[in-house]
């Protein structure tokens, strides 16, 4: 049973749409996973996505190490989304 109604862009209020557009225009390119839930509270979504974007894109790690850290953490914490979303990205960055 779904606890929160899924939404389309047309369902978003002005504040949600602004945060949505910031996310889509950034390096993520789309609003998926936890970001979709967080967007129910646009203030939370804005801050959480900024922290996540920094952790993923703003560190000194190259992309392959960043993705390795993400999937390792996702695996340790049994985060299905992190594993399913980031494992293909990590594999695409392996140069063997």
Q: Which ranges hold each PLM region?
A:
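Acidic, glycine/proline-rich low-complexity segments that act as flexible tails and inter-domain linkers
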Residues: 1-61
């Amino acid at each position: 049973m779904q606890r929160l109604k899924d939404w389309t862009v047309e369902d978003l209020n002005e504040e949600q749409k602004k945060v949505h557009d910031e996310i889509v225009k950034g390096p993520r390119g789309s609003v998926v996973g936890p970001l979709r839930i967080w967007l129910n509270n646009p203030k939370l979504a804005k801050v959480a996505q900024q922290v996540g974007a920094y952790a993923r894109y703003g560190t000194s790690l190259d992309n392959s190490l960043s993705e390795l850290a993400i999937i390792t953490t996702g695996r340790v914490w049994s985060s299905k989304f992190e594993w399913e979303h980031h494992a293909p990205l990590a594999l695409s960055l392996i140069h063997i």
